[in-house]
Design a protein with these regions (language model features):
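Short, glycine-/aromatic-enriched active-site segment of Class I SAM-dependent methyltransferases
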Residues: 198-213
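A conserved beta-strand element that flanks and buttresses the S-adenosyl-L-methionine
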Residues: 157-158
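A short, conserved alpha-helix within the catalytic core of class I
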Residues: 165-178
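Short amphipathic alpha-helix with an adjacent loop that forms part of the alpha/beta core around
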Residues: 143-152
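Short alpha-helix
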Residues: 213-240
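Conserved beta-strand signature within the Rossmann-like core of class I S-adenosyl-L-methionine
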Residues: 178-194
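Conserved catalytic loop of SAM-dependent methyltransferase domains
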Residues: 232-258
């Protein structure tokens, strides 16, 4: 029996990015494959006709490539951390229906998926927790969730498309709190500069009636700007379209590679990695 999704619900907001990951898998099979998204979309009762139509436009196809690269980059950093910390906690901040944690499973890490209660309720239906995996309800800005993470073997945290919706002060407070609680841990996430964040914000800020876009988190020079928050932070960044791959695949046009250069360059679309050093 298929899982029915109604229009204008929390469930609907969760399946749109899920559908994007399915489209990525079809358009760029050599670069990205999300078998869980492909399977889940098949198990869901929902009218995808509008999403299907939109997915074929030029900018939507480039948007799908962005999604694919972001997920690949974050997974690369998680796996890289697990090489030196095989028993680490792998923590997906604002998980939605993303299965990156599971796709990085090395057989000994512990996976935590964190999101709001209504999101986790849907996740428990569609993606119930497996071995060494927990779905945890929380508000990321309320640090009570720190106590639920077993970081005795290290901890790598990742957030995909999450911090654009946070105020700069919220991200700073969260990062400093994590540095206190998880020395030796690592946080990786995607970010962009102010111009890009304004473009991202155009749609959702209108509906939220928020006028001050400038208060929302954006970054151009991550090592300099975020590094200044706290002396314990070891900050680096790489372009998220071309920082991990050259995109020289038959499925990616020269025009899309040009757009990727613009994204990484002018828009500072990047993957930021923060290592939490010891107390100073």
């Amino acid at each position: 029996m298929k899982y029915k999704i109604e229009k204008n619900t929390v469930q609907e907001t969760l399946i749109i990015p899920l559908y994007a990951r399915k489209i990525c898998s079809e358009l760029y099979p050599n670069l990205y494959r999300d078998e869980t998204a492909v399977r889940l979309i098949d198990e869901i009762d929902y009218d995808f006709s509008e999403a299907e139509k939109n997915s074929r436009s030029l900018m939507q196809r480039f948007g799908s490539l962005e999604v694919a690269m972001r997920q690949n980059d974050l997974a690369f950093e998680v796996r890289d951390y697990l090489k030196s910390h095989p028993n680490a906690a792998v923590v997906n901040l604002g998980c939605g229906l993303d299965s990156t944690g599971k796709s990085c499973d090395n057989g000994s890490c512990n996976i935590y998926n964190l999101d709001f209660p209504d999101v986790i309720a849907v996740r428990n239906e569609l993606l119930p927790a497996g071995d060494r995996e927990k779905n945890i309800t929380c508000d990321l800005n309320n640090t009570e969730w720190f106590a639920k993470i077993d970081a005795s073997g290290g901890a790598v945290f990742f957030a995909s498309g999450v911090f654009y919706y946070f105020l700069t002060e919220q991200v700073k407070a969260l990062v400093q709190g994590m540095a206190d609680a998880f020395p030796g841990g690592e946080l990786v996430f995607d970010a962009a500069n102010r111009a890009a964040v304004k473009m991202i914000a155009k749609t959702w800020l209108k509906s939220a009636k928020i006028k001050d876009v400038g208060a929302y988190f954006a970054v151009s020079d991550a090592p300099k700007e975020i590094g200044a928050w706290d002396s314990r932070l070891q900050v680096s960044s790489r372009g998220y379209m071309l920082g991990y791959t050259d995109l020289k695949d038959p499925s990616v046009s020269g025009f899309f590679r040009f757009l990727a250069k613009v994204g990484d360059g002018m828009m500072k679309m990047q993957i930021v990695k923060i290592g939490f050093g010891g107390r100073k």
